[in-house]
Regions:
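Terminal-proximal interaction/regulatory segments of ATP-powered molecular machines
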Residues: 1-122
Length: 123
């Protein structure tokens, strides 16, 4: 089934190429759409194009490793609270409780407070 092959290419693009080739996912998704719209036999060109590009791409398992680490931490600490400075403060009560206190947008500077709950930081 050509859709199954194209679907596996989409998964491979993130799972095995990931950040080493940021264009791989876009190509794989475009290939999947082409297979759906064009159909066989012409979609073979799209499948071969994508297969060759994915095979030639540098590979990285960084996304898989980081995702698995994040899932393991979430399972280990299922009830860790969101740090107060990251919580939305739409009411005066929430502001008085310290929600969103000291929050600064991350871009352009080092964030001294961090984003992880205290118990996870210690792990």
């Amino acid at each position: 089934d050509p859709k199954f092959i194209a679907r596996r290419m989409v998964i491979f693009a993130s799972e095995d190429i990931g950040l080493a080739g940021n264009g791989a996912l876009s190509l794989a998704v475009a290939t999947f759409e082409a297979v759906e719209r064009v159909g066989l036999p012409e979609a073979r060109y799209n499948l071969f194009h994508c297969a060759i590009a994915l095979a030639r791409s540098q590979k990285s398992r960084e996304i898989t490793d980081l995702m698995n680490d994040a899932i393991a931490l979430a399972r280990k600490y299922p009830n860790s609270p969101v740090p107060l400075h990251l919580r939305n403060a739409p009411t005066k009560l929430m502001k008085d409780l310290g929600y969103n206190k000291g929050y600064k947008w991350q871009a352009g500077f080092q964030h001294e407070k961090g984003f992880l709950p205290e118990d996870i930081k210690k792990d």
